[in-house]
């Protein structure tokens, strides 16, 4: 999937005029792409449209109008757009009680080795953004990719084959099937140009 192009990013005035409709459309787009695995992990699968929304919102929040800064934001956020034969997601580690955040995150150190996408009897381990990791600490927001490759991407597009997100961390073991509207939305990413 190609990234967001400069000509697709609106200036602040033009964006403000369509923002309400764009926000409503993005909320609907993200609904089937938000997948909980257990009670602590939520994957929000990204594509060009979700990333474009994030770019527009960041430019709006920071009141960015300088061309070089706009191009910088596009470049940074385009790293979230999945490449060919892959899926990408923002992984949110949800910890509702502030006083538990550090302890719960510490319990999940090493999670980058334990997240998988299964399709039929095949599996691919998630690739985490190395820039977000230290050996003794993780953050509550992670960026992950599932590099399926051509064969597994093709298999994922076959709704007859079961697919699921699976976490096998010693302190957190859960899985969630990928089906219905969620699966269809991710399939559309894999076939997009």
Where in this protein do the model-derived segments appear?
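Long, contiguous binding/interaction regions
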Residues: 1-86, 90, 94-193
């Amino acid at each position: 999937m190609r990234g967001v192009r400069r000509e697709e990013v609106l200036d602040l005035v033009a964006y403000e005029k369509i923002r309400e409709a764009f926000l409503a459309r993005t909320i609907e787009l993200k609904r089937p792409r938000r997948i909980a695995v257990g009670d602590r992990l939520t994957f929000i699968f990204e594509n060009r449209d979700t990333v474009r929304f994030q770019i527009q919102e960041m430019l709006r929040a920071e009141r960015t109008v300088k061309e070089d800064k706009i191009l910088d934001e596009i470049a940074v956020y385009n790293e979230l757009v999945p490449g060919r034969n892959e899926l990408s997601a923002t992984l949110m580690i949800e910890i509702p009680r502030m006083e538990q955040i550090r302890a719960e995150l510490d319990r999940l150190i090493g999670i980058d080795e334990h997240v998988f996408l299964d399709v039929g009897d095949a599996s691919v381990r998630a690739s985490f953004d190395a820039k977000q990791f230290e050996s003794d600490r993780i953050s509550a927001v992670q960026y992950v990719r599932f590099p399926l490759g051509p064969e597994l991407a093709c298999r994922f597009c076959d709704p007859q084959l079961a697919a699921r997100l699976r976490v096998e961390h010693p302190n957190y073991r859960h899985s969630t099937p990928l089906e219905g509207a969620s699966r269809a939305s991710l399939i559309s990413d894999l076939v997009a140009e």
